[in-house]
């Protein structure tokens, strides 16, 4: 069971901005209500400009979280578009491989965090492509979305996810994140479940998932050329 959670900003530094303070407070309280101890790593709240200009600090936070024996879960604050810049500080001297040696910590996040998942996959760490702190735990609508909450609770209580089934609801994206949106639910619509595009409805094998835009960048290489 998870007890201690480290929040890291490996992509964008939005979480450290004053305009996101009300969301941070909501998320921190929700985690505390689960009985979790939340630790924001030293640079997690450094803000957009610092995080943008100092990928070495982002990498240092990730390494410190893995090295800390008290941390059970590493939760990414939010995605972004440049976490690839951490690579030299994680791989040049084998820093990441050394830091994760023997670890069974949960690593959780999505979007640009796909890159971090692949980095950790490279050094043999199993990760969970799922909730981020700001986007999901800090949801303004009064509570975490039910589908999100269901799997988050399973993960912190059991350390794993046994099976993923479709949500019966989809939600329109929130466009206003100001304090006045606190308690305002997202417009919801019925969902029809998985859609089979081709092939057999039953198949087995290993799969690497993630953000399709980020995965495309791995092969295209043109975005930051």
PLM feature segments, named:
Residues 39-42, 75-76, 107-110, 127-130, ...:
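General beta-strand structural signal in soluble alpha/beta enzymes
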Residues 90-122, 126-134:
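Short, acidic/small-residue loops that bind anionic groups at enzyme active sites
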Residues 207-225:
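Oxyanion-binding "anion nests"
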């Amino acid at each position: 069971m998870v007890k201690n959670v480290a929040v890291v900003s490996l992509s964008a530094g939005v979480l450290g901005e004053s305009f996101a303070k009300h969301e941070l407070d909501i998320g921190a309280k929700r985690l505390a209500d689960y009985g979790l101890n939340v630790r924001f790593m030293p640079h997690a709240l450094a803000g957009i400009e610092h995080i943008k200009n100092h990928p070495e600090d982002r990498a240092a936070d990730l390494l410190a979280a893995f090295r800390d024996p008290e941390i059970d879960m590493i939760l990414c604050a939010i995605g972004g578009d440049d976490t690839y810049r951490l690579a030299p500080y994680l791989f040049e001297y084998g820093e990441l491989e050394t830091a994760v040696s023997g670890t069974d910590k949960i690593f959780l996040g999505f979007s640009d965090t796909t890159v971090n998942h692949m980095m950790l996959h490279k050094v043999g760490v199993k990760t969970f492509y799922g909730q981020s702190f700001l986007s999901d735990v800090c949801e303004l609508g009064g509570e975490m979305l039910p589908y999100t909450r269901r799997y988050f609770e399973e993960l912190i209580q059991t350390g794993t996810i046994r099976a993923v089934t479709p949500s019966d609801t989809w939600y329109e994206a929130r466009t206003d994140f100001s304090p006045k949106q606190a308690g305002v639910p997202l417009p919801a619509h019925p969902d029809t479940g998985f859609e089979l595009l081709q092939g057999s409805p039953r198949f087995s094998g290993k799969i690497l998932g993630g953000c399709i835009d980020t995965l495309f960048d791995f092969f295209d290489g043109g975005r930051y050329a």
